[in-house]
Amino acid sequence: MREPETGPFLRRMKTSDLRAVMDIDARSLPKPWSEGIWRSELESPFALYLVLEEGDEIVGQIGVRNVLDELHVTNVAVHPEHRRRGHARVLIQAALSAYPDAGLVHLEVRPTNTAAVTLYRSLGFRETGRRPRYYGDEDALLMTLDLLAGRP
């Protein structure tokens, strides 16, 4: 008898997840974070890191830092074999919903990462500036989402 399939499952990231998370990071980013950076972020009281699991596999992650009433998305990555399934959208929406009183959400993205830029725009993020040579070889596109827009 086959076990019933379960959909994606979101949970807080643990240090025991770092091997899988760092693998996804390495497959997704030209300059992935070191284990030391990951451990430091997981220990921060101002950060929330979530993973998305399918079955027993971590397929994506997101990190958000909370500064007063603003959020900064520090990391979003989905395993290449699991992209284009809405996982990044689920991760972003889950992380933002953890902060119902947040006003603004900021992030940086490579302008050449057109899939991510398109996703962020579809979620309501707007371009607010650029950081020259932020990635060394490329500028960063600064994007902001106003969560207060439309609230009474």
What residues fall within each predicted segment?
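Conserved GNAT acetyl-CoA-binding A-motif
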Residues: 98-109, 131
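Conserved acetyl-CoA-binding loop-helix of GNAT-fold acetyltransferases
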Residues: 78, 84-97, 117-122
